[in-house]
């Protein structure tokens, strides 16, 4: 009986060791932007200009938590890295943060407000690719809808690209962030002067 008990114990130990040896590296979560040090911004006041950035629209294949790299017609996801949230949410946050940097006089938010905002920014990304060759590309169109219904919405579109390393997940995140920063800059330059 003790021999059988010993065999079961040994089998459990071997199974545990095999499972532990099969475990991969720990999962790393990434965001598109980092928060800088808190600035001593002046209070906005009761009638501050409010700019609401609506959730960005992306093709379904890309609106995931997976970090994707295109190899020809194949999308490969990272085994070790993920976005901390769905990509559309991360891009929305990035755009709002960049617009807030450009417009310190305004409250730039991704949250709906009680009163209608002075401007609502709606962004549709039709293409967002990072290739194994190290090229990131974004094609987008966007509207700036004034809160004043007597004014017409402004419509824009643009294509942006950047090149860089894609050897690691951090490289992919940095490259994707660079091309999305170009989009944010263009939105701020032409839409919200």
For each predicted feature, which ranges?
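Surface-exposed short loop/turn segments
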Residues: 23-41, 102-149, 164-166
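Sec-exported extracytoplasmic/periplasmic mature domains
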Residues: 96-104, 188-192
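Short secondary-structure boundary motifs at beta->alpha junctions and helix caps
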Residues: 74-84, 149-189
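Sec-dependent bacterial lipoprotein signal peptides
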Residues: 1-22
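Conserved Nudix-box catalytic region and its N-terminal flanking loop in Nudix hydrolases
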Residues: 85-89
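Soluble periplasmic/extracytoplasmic beta-strand elements of cell-envelope proteins
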Residues: 50-56, 68, 120-124, 137-143, ...
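A structural "domain/chain start" motif
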Residues: 22-84, 117, 192-193
